[in-house]
Amino acid sequence: MPATPDALSIARDLLRCPSVTPADAGALDVLDRLLRGAGFEVHRVTFSEPGAADIDNLYARIGTGAPHLMFAGHTDVVPPGDVSAWSHGAFAGEVADGQLYGRGAVDMKGGIACAVAAVLVYLAACGGQPKGSISFLITGDEEDIAVNGTVKLLQWADARGENFDHCIVGEPSNVEELGDCIKIGRRGSLSGTLIVDGVQGHVAYPQRAVNPVPDIATLIVALSHEPLDHGTAQFQPSNLEFTSVDVGNAATNVIPAQARAKFNIRFNDQHSIKSLQALIEHHLAAACGNRIRARIEWLPSNAGAFVTKPGPFTDLVTAAIEQVTGRRPELNTGGGTSDARFITHYCPVIEFGLVGQTMHKVDERTPVSDLEKLTAIYRGVLERYFA
């Protein structure tokens, strides 16, 4: 019988696929081959959307009973940037000084590799079949607009009658050291553009114009300083941040007709997207009074806030982490959005993977020892889950 591949070899094979979103570049083929070889029933599903790239996705399951534990993740990666700035090839999967280098090493091909390696070892030890079901739900559409990936793959699986009891997303959840953090939720994300209308005119005749620049500055200050909430036991306060201001005016002697400012809000579970939009519109109306003409164009959002309540599943994962690392992880909801926001509608979900310090950076890398430890943690989860 051939030796079971370890996480390092799987990760290197994945890293050598330059799967910059939305390209797959063979990454799902690597997983397809390994999982079919272990007895999984594997499905490859392509989704389309007008104006977006077609995306290949993978769903694999072994076992037919309960409980059903799903591992979820993505094989697409962000661009490497200036490849000449990398000390090792961005898609070479090289190991140097005990570190595995490559775009996606941390986010999140390394985490997927550890999950696959752990499952293969676990299955080999229990005769090839779990006492329940194990599945992998892997997309190539997470780093960009995320419309043809996890959200549709979950709908497809649900239509087939798939039921999940719990899910682990292998995103890089740890801040400083492996085992320091489990993500049990995420804040939501909502973006928009504040638009202030004025009247264009010559700067020498301001009485004949209405300058939107001072007005938008007033509104930016007002909206930035208006508290949205005071946080909760599991979430920090929501925050609104302006990210750009533009008047589309290259001239120095023309008062512009319009000013625009883009912003993003990261919000906790005290708000829904609709209630938050209403709150911001209320604050805007109060700041405008009867003088300023302003409005907001909202961007579509599917990123609501969610939290998985601590309980037996988080306790089980915590125990597996403590056994391997000696650390008791913090349960928190910090960071950006992830595909866990879609999975939470189907089952309780947590995120636990590698350390995220180098994700999206030049020379993204992870210690090989962390790959080994994360594999051991995932195997510990499997042993406890199906005990």
UniProtKB/Swiss-Prot annotation:
The record's EC number reads 3.5.1.18
Pathway in which the depicted protein is active: Amino-acid biosynthesis; L-lysine biosynthesis via DAP pathway; LL-2,6-diaminopimelate from (S)-tetrahydrodipicolinate (succinylase route): step 3/3
Asked whether the keyword Hydrolase is assigned, the reply is: yes
Query: InterPro entries from the entry?
Result: ArgE/DapE_CS, Bact_exopeptidase_dim_dom, DapE_proteobac, Peptidase_M20, Peptidase_M20_dimer, Peptidase_M20A
Quaternary structure per UniProt? Homodimer.
The active site annotation covers D76, E142 (proton acceptor)
Q: Which Pfam families match?
A: M20_dimer, Peptidase_M20
Similarity field: Belongs to the peptidase M20A family. DapE subfamily.
Described purpose of this protein according to its UniProt entry: Catalyzes the hydrolysis of N-succinyl-L,L-diaminopimelic acid (SDAP), forming succinate and LL-2,6-diaminopimelate (DAP), an intermediate involved in the bacterial biosynthesis of lysine and meso-diaminopimelic acid, an essential component of bacterial cell walls.
Binding residues annotated for Zn(2+) 2, in chain numbering: D107, E143, H360
Taxonomy of origin reads: Bacteria, Pseudomonadati, Pseudomonadota, Alphaproteobacteria, Hyphomicrobiales
Q: Which cofactor does it need?
A: Zn(2+); Co(2+)
Q: What is this protein called?
A: Succinyl-diaminopimelate desuccinylase
Q: Which GO terms describe its molecular function?
A: acetylornithine deacetylase activity; cobalt ion binding; succinyl-diaminopimelate desuccinylase activity; zinc ion binding
